[in-house]
C-alpha cells in the first residue's frame, strides 16, 4: 500500500472459539488483518492472514472479518486484494473449523466480474482456503514461499505411500501444469510489486474505465523493425514477444500465465496510454498451434476483459 494509507478494521477482535481440551487461547485479530488503503492513489480493500497467530487458520471471527470486508469493497466499488499465508481450517477447536467459508465462497462468486479480486500467495494455502484463490480473477504466487494444495505432501504420502517434494503445489507447478497461477514473483517483495503493477491495468470496478497513463512514446513512432522480426518464410518460428515490445507503449507488457500454454500469449499493455488486453499467437512454441490448454487460457482472459471494459487486441500467426 501507499505509505500511511492503511486503515484497519476489526483490530480489537479475538477468537471466539474454545479448544476441544477446554484450554483458553489468545488470537489477536483472530489471525486476520483487514482494512482499506491506497495503491497509486486508488482505494483498495486488503485482507491478510497472519501466520504468526494460530498458523493464520480460519476461525469464526476471522471469516466474518473477511465477509464484511468484501461486502464493503463491493458496495464501494474498489478492488479486493488477498495476502494469504494460512494453514487452513482451525483444527482442535469446538467451533466448526471452516465456519463461514461457504458464505466466503458465495460472495467471491457473487462479486466476480464486479470488482477485481486478486489473490497473493506468500506462504502455504491449505485445505478449505485453497479453493479461494481459484475463485479470484488473478492469482499471484511467490516462488520462494507459496504453496497451494488441499492436503500437501504428508497427506498425499499417507494416502498413496508416494513420496513427493514441496515443489508439487508450488508456484512453478501451478503456473506450468495446472494453470491456476497467473503471475509468479521470485520472492514476497517481487510478488507484491507485481500485484501493484497488475492493479495499474485494472479499473476499480466494472462500471469504470482502466486508469489512463500518459505515454512517453510517440504514437507515430517507427515500428518498421517488425519486418526484421517476422520472417518471410512461414515455416520459420519466431518469438512474438519481440513484436509486442515494438507495438506497445514504452515496451511495457504485463504477461498473464506466461508459463502455461506458452504458444498463446496473453497480457496487458497500453496503446497511446489506454489499457488493452493483448492476445497473440507465439510461433516460437509448438508452431502456435491452439490446443485445449491454450483455449482455456484465452477464454478465461477474455472473461476478465469483458467484465472490466478492457478492449481486446489480437495478433494472429497460427496454422
PLM segments and residue spans:
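A short, charged helix-loop
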Residues: 155-157
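Terminal-region recognition feature
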Residues: 1-118, 124, 129-131, 135-151, ...
